[in-house]
Each structure stands twice: as structure tokens, then as C-alpha cells.
Amino acid sequence: MDSRSRLEDNPNEHAVVVVTGAAGAVGSRVVRRLVHDHEGIDVRAVDKANVDARPGLDVKRVDLASDDLTSVFAGATSVVHLATAVTPDVNDPSADELELAIVSRVLDAAAEVGVSHVCVLSTAMVYGAWVDNPVPLTEDADVRPNPDFPWAITRAAVERAVLEWGSGREAAVSILRPTAVVTADTLGRLAQVLHTARVGIAADGDPPVQYLHVDDLAAAVVAAIQTRFDGVANVAPDSWIPPDALADLEGPQARVRVPAWAARAVAAVRQRSGLAPIPPGIVPYTSHSWVVANDRIRALGWEADYSNEEAWVVSHDPSPLEQLPARRRQELALGAAAALAIGCAVGAVLVLRRLRRN
């Protein structure tokens, strides 16, 4: 990154930062940090949902899919695109198409008004979860999301579009790849899907995991804005949670280990029936490591306030089961696992009978 691109190295330039998705969990925190902690930056909050008005904040209620964005972005020096139409727990091709169409509209408008910096959120899942992944993955690793997980594939497509836009243009492009994000008392959508996929009937494998608090992600976005970072950066706390430590945090779980192909089949059935939001493509991410290094984002002056373990703890509201003594929880977990195994066997028999009838 060229240090001359830093905001503090250009005191004569008036910074106007547009934040899309400003009503969301990440966007609202980014807006709040920019308004409260960074004098000399005008912040324009863009969302089709309501955004709380506050001094120093210009709020625009806009539908990114249809409204004129050139007028909304006029005068902006940075566009931080945090709005999204897709979630990791839903496979919707039309939403994927809309996501890419909105990205294209945002980039076209940014080019039209002469924006000099664009920042977007991707995901560490674009590296894919593969048996040969190094631990940890750096930004130099290939982008190869698992082919049957549409959400990660779409994030990789967003990255390509943004990088192509920045190629040959006098503008900095920041792409941030966070790991699974959590908030206070709540797992994020991705973290919840991963957790659900690892209990019950789960694939073999116990990879290390990472959890990123949403406040730390917002701080990383602000660091990219402040430095006008030009490049790709992973966002995760230092290190990761090894399997044995995660087991201690979670306590006994009802879990039946099966081959990956069987776990995928079960996930497909659970998703189609509405029992659980587990896309089959998430299964490899519960079997193989995809933890990432954070050296590059730390070089911008960013540091996580929450460790992986702390992020997990603050996001986790103990259930009545988890408040029972450890021995009793273990007994219940074993009983539940046995019930799951019996259920799987019965289900397999019923499926075979149906196939024979057909």
C-alpha cells in the first residue's frame, strides 16, 4: 500500500465516506465509529431501512437495486459497500444475481463521481475448506471456494468484480475477508450455520475455528478507510481455537460422526424440510481448516479487542441444558446421540423401501 494514500497524509482533501448497509450490524457500527472518533470525515449513511439520525451524519434512504446512485455518491471520496442481498443459510440464485447486479451499480456510480477508494466485505470462506489448506491461510492463498456453497462462490465473484474495477484505475480497493462473525449474545448467520452443522449428524473432522466480534470487524473496516488500504486483508483475532478447547467451551454435544457424503445428504434433507438452515456445501467447512492469518490487517494498526474464545463466550447465551452439571450433560448427550443414530437407521430403511417401490 502506498503510504501517500492515507487520509492523514492528505490534510487538504475533504473526506466524504459513503457507507451502504448503514442500518446493518456492521454498517451501523462503522458509521458510529466514523462519526464519533474521526473528525474531518463527513459520513453519508445509505440504506433502504431506517438509519438513526445523529449530528454529523447525512442519512440517505436508498434502494441500491433501483435508485439513482450517482446523485447519492456525489462528492464522495470513499464508498464502503456493506449492504448485501444474500445470507449463508439460504440458497437463492435470484438473490445471488441481485447481489452482483447491485455491486455493479455501486461500482459504476463510484466511477462516475470519481471515488478514489472502495471498500467491500468478503469472507475468509473464499479460500475454501480443503484437506491441503495450510494453517493459517494468508492472503497469498488461492481463492477456491468449495463448489457447492453458493454464498462463498458469490463472495468470490464480488471480489473479482471489485478487483477488475480497480485495475488500471487511480483508486484504492480494500477487500476484507472476515472469519465467522458474532455479536453480543448472538451467533452471526454464518457462525450459527457452522455450529448447527457440527452438531447432530456431523461429518468426520475437527478443524480449528475462529470467531470475530462484530465490533472488531467494524474497527477493521474503519482502519481500511482511514489508511485507504489498497489490497486484500483477512480479519480474525490472533491464533484460533483448537478442537479440544472448543469442546471444552461447548460442553458435551449430541453428535453422530458420519462420512462427509452422508453429512451432506442429511444437510440437504434438513434444509429442504426446513428443520435446519444447513446448506450441504457448508459441510467441508466443518471438516477441514480454513483459519486465517491476520498480519496484514494488524499492519494497519488494527488489533482485536476480543480473542476467539472471548468472542465465542460473549456471543453465547447458555441454554438450560448447558447449566446442568457436566456429568448429567454428558449422559443426555450420549442419549441424544443414540437416538440420532437410531433415527438415521430408520430413515435409511424408509428411503430404501421407497426406492424399491419406485
What are these regions (language model features)?
Residues H14-E39:
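N-terminal Rossmann NAD(P)H-binding glycine-rich loop of SDR-like oxidoreductase domains
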Residues S307-N358:
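Amphipathic terminal alpha-helices
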Residues G166-Q210:
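NAD(P)-dependent short-chain dehydrogenase/reductase
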Residues V131-V181:
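Catalytic helix-loop patch of NAD(P)-dependent Rossmann-fold dehydrogenases
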